């Protein structure tokens, strides 16, 4: 911590760093014009940056330049149990690697406070219509994840600065919003803005509090945990002015789905967004959090709101201590982060979004930005032909378009009291009119916080949700993360036998193909009250605005408008029922972690038969060998919008998959296969998930008529034999054949899972060439020593007529964003050898990334640094 510009903070016993003065000393009048993000980044530079580069780094912010890297030191790391666990498995493996070479393994410790919340492990095996669902689901979670939870318990005693919130307590982002983020930190007598990175792409949830919170992969999180700076260049900072006021009956979910569509079209990929204007000013923090949560869905890195009175009211409402709330207000006003101090902020680009034009929406059938107004469902071909569906229902059959899953799920919506209370009020009115859930609908309610249950019970609507089948099944991610659990066997068999077009409706944040459930062919995102309405309707063919949900006792038709609660009803009940005491009752005991014994050994005692936790291989064998970048074969040629769900799916493991066959061989019963996500601590299981998504289109796998065959398939060259992806990977591994992947636009969008990069690296992939990369996945590729290259504008796999028979090499000097040459060697139709030289851009974006890549990845770099004594 530096000393220059360190001053007493008026009205407290604390000190702070006067970033305003530091900036004004360089350029008078500049500070007031800085965006919120730049002010926070400038403060941490003044507080922690090497004085030798401080002025240059501040000038980057003042002059809006992107010429030089500067360090970012996040104050905290938050993890969920999937990526958080794999990060700690990596650190445990790093300890072993260091011990094997004579080093001291106990030196490997997080130095930045790290909080791990177990929230990704629970599958909804029992739906919300079972009164004992919560206890049953938790018991199954504990049984299936005993290996994982044993390791996580060990980390609490083996590593310093690691706190664990065990399973059954809520979702990481919601707990971060409601409790963990102080907004303003107080450490060593110094006040400064809270910042954090999290091992999940929805970490920006707490941007709603004015806290820069960024989703990263597990590898980058490990880097931050160990006290390394996260080097960056000034990001694009875009102002988003929210004008107008929402129409009656419009939820924050409707707004965020419309915003996601709008911002995707505006191409804000990688940018830090700052929301302001009358629309932002009038929003509660709950509504703001719904918007910030879906940052990755519109492609941005952060979605900030200024600190204002609404922030202060929320901190008070959620039970923060009065002294802490006072510190947030006084510090924000002192340093110029208060909303009224941001009126002079200048943005190089400002977008304008009118809240008054937002209608009731859903998104689907397979992308969060594919918004559909509920008024247009028939015109879009989603609703319609309801008579046929109802005729099937009358015959005792599951109807066309059946909603087989209806889930109120996800921190996106369950951290917003207005949304959950609205669902409860709609359920109450539906019950009063005699409406019921259709029997084939697996309904569930999984709030991200125990506080939600307390205020819904206080509001008197929890019992109404339970009556309609939306009892609480868990406090975890569940369906939103693809952990929707098994269907009733008879329902599943009918779907298979009749090839029923079945769907899911959920209040989550993602609906990529194959993510929610293997037998839900498509999925739609909707607000919590709409989820309840669709459970009553029972089919997506139902026009939610105009079709009748049923009849009352007098035979009169009931429509959505008849049960939709008014804004006044919702707001009055929220005001009456949500209280600080509820949050204190939940969080005070949860965070009373007490004293912990130190582990007897710094080395983990690996269980050889475990399919969940295994010593990682990253410092040995082929991964320790240099990459050739020569004579590479393509493993896959892929279209636009490849997601990390395509690259390494998270959902349930099926018996006929490569991972399922492996688990069966290891003696695991099929009912305990669990999800791909839960096995990511064991590379032997997890690598079999690489490209295991049945919805994948590998353009190398074509039918005789030239159409692309869907599935987890690859074509092995030079033989041209098509086989399952995992068998192709094994074939190439046995041949020690280096591989390449060719892709289209927006490669790697979606979840921040590092196994989307680890899997391809273990497969032998050395290079990925795409038209564009999503930020987190590109960083993960670098962290695994995979070289990301970007086609120049106007060049792509189609213009080059690539078909997968080629050999590829890369030549040139690897440097940040340097020009390299992709050399493509192939045979022409007349049997001649053709060589094409394709200019590409090296997407190692900083000098630090070049160093990491040259070391073979961050894990190899860590080992080198610890053995050489270059620890943080």
Give the positions of each predicted feature.
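Fe-S-dependent hydro-lyases/dehydratases of central metabolism
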Residues: 1-872
């Amino acid at each position: 911590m530096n000393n220059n510009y360190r001053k007493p903070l008026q009205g407290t016993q604390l000190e702070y760093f006067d970033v305003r003065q530091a900036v004004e000393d360089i350029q008078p009048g500049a500070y007031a014009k800085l965006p919120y993000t730049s002010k926070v980044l400038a403060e941490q530079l003044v507080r922690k940056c090497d004085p030798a580069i401080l002025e240059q780094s501040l000038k980057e912010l003042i002059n809006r330049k992107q010429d030089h890297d500067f360090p970012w030191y996040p104050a905290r790391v938050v993890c969920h149990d999937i990526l958080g666990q794999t990060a700690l498995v990596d650190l445990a493996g790093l300890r072993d690697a260091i011990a094997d070479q004579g080093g001291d393994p106990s030196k490997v410790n997080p130095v930045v406070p790290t909080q791990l919340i177990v929230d990704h492990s629970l599958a909804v095996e029992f739906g919300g219509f079972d009164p004992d669902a919560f206890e049953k689901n938790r018991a199954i979670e504990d049984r299936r994840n005993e290996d994982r939870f044993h390791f996580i318990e060990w980390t609490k005693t083996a590593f310093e600065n690691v706190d664990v919130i065990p399973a059954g307590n809520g979702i990481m982002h919601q707990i971060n919003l409601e409790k963990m983020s102080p907004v303003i930190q107080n450490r060593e007598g110094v006040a400064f803005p809270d910042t954090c990175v999290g091992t999940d792409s929805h970490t920006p949830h707490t941007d709603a509090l004015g806290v820069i919170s960024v989703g990263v992969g597990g590898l980058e999180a490990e880097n931050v945990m160990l006290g390394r700076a996260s080097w960056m260049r000034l990001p694009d900072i875009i102002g988003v002015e929210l004008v107008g006021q929402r129409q009656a009956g419009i939820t924050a979910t409707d707004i965020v789905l419309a915003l996601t569509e709008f911002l995707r079209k505006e191409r804000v990929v990688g940018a830090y967004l700052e929301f302001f204007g009358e629309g932002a000013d009038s929003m509660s923090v709950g509504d703001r959090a719904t918007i910030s949560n879906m940052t990755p869905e519109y492609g941005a890195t952060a979605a900030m709101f200024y600190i204002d009175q609404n922030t202060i009211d929320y901190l008070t409402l959620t039970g923060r201590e009065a002294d802490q709330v006072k510190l947030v207000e006084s510090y924000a006003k002192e340093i110029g982060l208060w909303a009224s101090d941001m009126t002079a902020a200048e943005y190089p680009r400002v977008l304008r979004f009118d809240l008054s034009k937002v209608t009731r929406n859903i998104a689907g059938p397979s992308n969060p930005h594919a918004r559909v107004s509920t008024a247009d469902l028939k015109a879009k071909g989603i609703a319609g032909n309801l008579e046929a569906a109802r005729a099937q229902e009358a015959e005792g059959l599951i109807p066309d378009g059946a909603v087989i899953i209806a889930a109120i799920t996800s921190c996106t919506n369950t951290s917003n009291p207005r949304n959950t209370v609205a669902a409860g009020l709609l359920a109450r009115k539906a019950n009063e009119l005699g409406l019921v859930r259709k029997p084939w609908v697996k309904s569930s309610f999984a709030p991200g916080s125990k506080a939600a249950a307390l205020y819904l019970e206080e509001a008197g609507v929890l019992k109404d949700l339970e009556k309609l089948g939306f009892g609480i099944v868990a406090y975890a991610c569940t369906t939103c993360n693809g952990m929707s659990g098994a269907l009733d066997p008879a329902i599943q068999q009918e779907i298979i036998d009749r090839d029923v077009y079945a769907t899911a409706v959920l209040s989550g944040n993602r609906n990529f193909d194959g993510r929610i459930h293997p037998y839900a062919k498509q999925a739609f995102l909707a607000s919590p009250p709409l989820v309840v309405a669709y459970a009553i309707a029972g089919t997506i063919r139902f026009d939610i605005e105009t079709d009748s949900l049923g009849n009352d006792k007098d035979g009169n038709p009931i429509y959505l408008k008849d049960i939709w609660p008014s804004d006044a009803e919702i707001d009055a009940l929220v005001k009456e029922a949500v209280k600080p005491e509820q949050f204190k009752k939940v969080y005070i005991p949860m965070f009373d972690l007490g004293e912990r014994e130190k582990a007897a050994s710094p080395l983990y005692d690996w269980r050889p038969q475990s399919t969940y936790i295994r010593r990682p291989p990253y410092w040995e064998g082929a991964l320790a060998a240099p990459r050739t970048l020569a004579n590479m074969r393509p493993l896959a040629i892929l279209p636009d919008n490849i997601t990390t769900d395509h690259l390494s799916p998270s959902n349930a493991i099926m018996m006929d998959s490569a991972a399922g066959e492996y688990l069966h061989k290891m003696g695991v019963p099929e009912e305990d296969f669990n999800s791909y996500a839960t096995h990511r601590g064991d590379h032997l299981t997890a690598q079999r998930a690489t490209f295991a998504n049945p919805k994948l289109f590998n353009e190398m796998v074509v039918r005789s008529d030239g159409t692309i065959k869907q599935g987890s398939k690859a074509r092995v060259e030079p033989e041209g034999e098509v086989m399952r992806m995992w068998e192709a990977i094994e074939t190439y591994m046995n041949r020690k054949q280096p591989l390449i992947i060719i892709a289209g636009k927006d490669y790697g969008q979606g979840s921040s899972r590092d196994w989307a990069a680890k899997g391809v690296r273990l497969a032998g992939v050395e290079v990925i060439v795409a038209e564009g990369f999503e930020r987190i996945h590109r960083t993960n590729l670098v962290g695994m020593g995979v070289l990301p290259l970007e086609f120049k504008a106007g060049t792509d796999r189609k213009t080059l007529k690539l078909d997968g028979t080629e050999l590829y090499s890369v030549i040139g000097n690897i440097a940040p964003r340097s020009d390299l040459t992709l050399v493509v060697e192939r045979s022409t139709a007349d049997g001649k050898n053709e060589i094409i030289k394709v200019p590409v851009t090296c997407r190692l974006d900083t000098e630090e990334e070049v160093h990491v890549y040259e070391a073979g990845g961050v894990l190899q770099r860590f080992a080198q640094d610890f053995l050489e004594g270059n620890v943080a």
